[in-house]
Design a protein with these regions (language model features):
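Low-complexity, acidic/polar, glycine-enriched regions of mature
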Residues: 20-193
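Bacterial Sec-dependent N-terminal signal peptides
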Residues: 1-23
């Protein structure tokens, strides 16, 4: 009888452990959201967003069941030019007054082997939602003595015009003043809760 009780207790402990969900919150001080877009066809402009939030919830050790949510305050855009930042906040681009948040909600986090993943989900900008995929590199975990941290780098490209951004004047030499493809890179350091 004692063996049965012990066996049941061990089984319960193991199944509880294996299905325990772990939540990770983004460490905003040690993370950033950057973007790059072509300008006048011949060069690129880089920028970032200063205000954002994100979380990851998973129960599997390989994170393959991870649910990821991310949001960006578009009014926090910074390209080191107040004039350009003001233009990006206008209706030509983000319309930050009417659509203050850009959001991402994951659909899948697929392991590709090693530390590589494909993160697919719904990205919403200007109230337009499209399914996008980011290439993710998982940096692993470390116990700092004050808690456990995990690191991720996500990279992907979106068509900004598909999200309702209107500014798209052509230049005489061909092409557009601002490219339609925007490369997004997120460096996320997450704190285990």
């Amino acid at each position: 009888m004692k063996k049965q009780v012990l066996g049941f207790a061990l089984f319960f402990a193991m199944t509880s452990f294996s299905f325990a969900q772990t939540t990770w919150k983004i460490d905003k001080t040690h993370s950033n959201v950057k973007f790059t877009v072509s300008h006048m066809v011949v060069s690129e402009v880089e920028g970032s967003f200063k205000m954002f939030d994100g979380s990851l919830v998973a129960s599997k050790p390989d994170l393959s069941d991870a649910s990821i949510n991310f949001s960006v305050d578009v009014a926090s855009v910074n390209t080191d030019s107040e004039r350009r930042d003001g233009h990006l906040k206008s209706d030509d681009f983000f319309n930050a007054e009417k659509f203050p948040k850009m959001t991402f909600v994951s659909k899948s986090f697929k392991p590709l082997g090693g530390n590589k993943y494909a993160l697919t989900g719904d990205l919403t900008i200007r109230d337009v939602t499209k399914t996008v995929t980011f290439d993710v590199t998982y940096g692993g975990q470390v116990n700092t003595g004050r808690g456990v941290k995990a690191g991720f780098k996500a990279k992907g490209t979106i068509d900004r015009l598909a999200f309702g951004q209107k500014f798209n004047p052509a230049i005489e030499a061909g092409g557009a003043v601002v490219g339609k493809d925007v490369e997004i890179t997120i460096f996320a350091e997450m704190d285990k809760q």
